[in-house]
Amino acid sequence: MTETKEEKVHKVFEKISPSYDRMNSVISFKLHVKWRKETMKLMRVQKGTNVLDVCCGTADWSIMMAEEIGPEGHVTGLDFSENMLKVGREKVKEADLHNVELIHGNAMELPFPDNSFDYVTIGFGLRNVPDYMQVLREMYRVLKPGGQLACIDTSQPNIPGWKQVFNAYFRYVMPVFGKFFAKSYKEYSWLQESTREFPGMSKLAEMFQDAGFSYVRYISHSGGASATHFGFKKKE
């Protein structure tokens, strides 16, 4: 029987969870931290707000958001990999944060009522879901009117030369790093496939609009290696 994308992704992240944080730093040369900080600055997050971090993984962005909104706010992190959540819960505990809850769930069917959150974030997770549009629509649904979505993910560089280098790096070098640092050549080979198949910046912006978002914009990071897309749910 052929594995579905959802089953394959779940198996990948259950296996790589112990080395995920270290590999993120190796693969991106720690640039993922810079990209997230740049995104946070542009979001202008307000204190005391309610946040959902979809595909939260090991909770890096959940923790950053919790520190930003302060003790009066609340962050819910959701992921479908219990092993990733286990790592995340340890990090939340070490950070001594009491305004973060990490739950097991499916981004395709968010277990929350409509209009629940002031902010929704998803970092390096959208490319791994079975249906991009379904997840975008779900995130739109749970946002409050006036709420903001921020999505960071890999992208497709357009700069001649850099595009070829980027593609070669993800296709040939990243799986080798995965084998050397995490003993997971097969898993990191698959992750480069998800990167290659993910829509480019302008196409993803169109998908945001199709899902209902307004005032959609995006910024590229590191020559288009990554991008952040922003969208708002219009006030009623």
From Swiss-Prot:
Claim: S-adenosyl-L-methionine is one of the keywords in the record: yes
GO terms under biological process: menaquinone biosynthetic process; methylation
Binding site for S-adenosyl-L-methionine: T58, D79, N106, A107
InterPro entries found in the cross-reference section: MenG_heptapren, SAM-dependent_MTases_sf, UbiE/COQ5_MeTrFase, UbiE/COQ5_MeTrFase_CS
Pfam families: Ubie_methyltran (PF01209)
Enzyme Commission designation: 2.1.1.163
Pathway: Quinol/quinone metabolism; menaquinone biosynthesis; menaquinol from 1,4-dihydroxy-2-naphthoate: step 2/2
Chemical reaction(s) catalysed: a 2-demethylmenaquinol + S-adenosyl-L-methionine = a menaquinol + S-adenosyl-L-homocysteine + H(+)
MF terms (GO), sorted A to Z: demethylmenaquinone methyltransferase activity
This protein's UniProt keywords: Menaquinone biosynthesis, Methyltransferase, S-adenosyl-L-methionine, Transferase
Top EC class of this enzyme: transferase
Record-linked NCBIfam families: MenG_heptapren, MenG_MenH_UbiE, PRK00216.1-4, PRK00216.1-5
Family: Belongs to the class I-like SAM-binding methyltransferase superfamily. MenG/UbiE family.
PANTHER family named among the record's database cross-references: 2-METHOXY-6-POLYPRENYL-1,4-BENZOQUINOL METHYLASE, MITOCHONDRIAL, METHYLTRANSFERASE
Database matches in HAMAP family: MenG_UbiE_methyltr (MF_01813)
Function summary: Methyltransferase required for the conversion of demethylmenaquinol (DMKH2) to menaquinol (MKH2).
Protein name: Demethylmenaquinone methyltransferase
